């Protein structure tokens, strides 16, 4: 008996994340006919415009699904632009009816907004994780490629959707079929869920010095509150002068200026992806002085935090999450 996979495409969705989820199902059917069926939905039943400008036709709107089906919300930039009370109510009804719910790329944001990730592990695209954590601090978010936690299945999007589907194929029909499918995509290996979403520090920054890689990792993990240069040096067991020399020789920078850049980059993401105030963003990135934050931000991005902030459209509030008091409004988080 075929298993039905449904993909709800939201405007601005990632084509890579979507296609990487569908293609493994298609290839699995080449080896064993009719294992899977897949369908595309949109909020209004019409075509959906992806982030790259492509238009994808849908098979229907928010229709009833049956127990045992899988529904993935596929999103990308600004997923909450598409969230409406009708969508939230539909997702909750699917959950009550035994449909497994998932998110691809930033689809997890929509599930969180609907109150459907409470008590479950979830992941999403690395670029949106900081904003997600700030907007939904009560939820358990990881940096894994994908998460399967009971009736919730989430993927970071991109090629991680392939790894997720290979895992689901292996669970349902055995690892050998998953290997056969992976070989059709010329994959060197099937990545486990705990693989890193991002390239290693050494690759991202073009450095090979072990101590330098370690200290950049410490900086990325401690943006609030930030560590002092002396504390950073102590953590990698070098002197302050040795640490400063490492940055000068390999990055033509100082530790403090490099660290400041990391924190400002995080601040920019939060400004563009959340409803946090400028003050809240500055505090979340380790800036105790709002004026220093604004000056530093303008120096790096040639715009003030308020000028650089993405404009979030007003929309009707989503339905109240289960068990929440009247008037509750879940914080927003958007990738982009």
From Swiss-Prot:
Traits of the deletion mutant: Cells are incapable of growth on carnitine.
The cross-references to PROSITE patterns, in alphabetical order and at most eight, read: HTH_ARAC_FAMILY_1, HTH_ARAC_FAMILY_2
Q: Which domain of life is it from?
A: Bacteria
The record ties this protein, via InterPro entries, to:
Class_I_gatase-like, DJ-1/PfpI, Homeodomain-like_sf, HTH_AraC, HTH_AraC-typ_CS, INH-QAR
- Tell me where in this chain the HTH araC/xylS-type domain is found: 213-311
* Annotated segments matching region Disordered: 305-336
SUPFAM superfamilies per record: Class I glutamine amidotransferase-like, Homeodomain-like
Q: Name one GO molecular function term.
A: DNA-binding transcription factor activity
Write out the function statement from the record: Induces the transcription of the PA5384-PA5388 operon in response to carnitine. This operon is involved in the degradation of L-carnitine, and allows P.aeruginosa to grow on L-carnitine as the sole source of carbon and nitrogen.
The name this protein carries in UniProt is HTH-type transcriptional regulator CdhR
The species is: Pseudomonas aeruginosa (strain ATCC 15692 / DSM 22644 / CIP 104116 / JCM 14847 / LMG 12228 / 1C / PRS 101 / PAO1)
The gene is cdhR
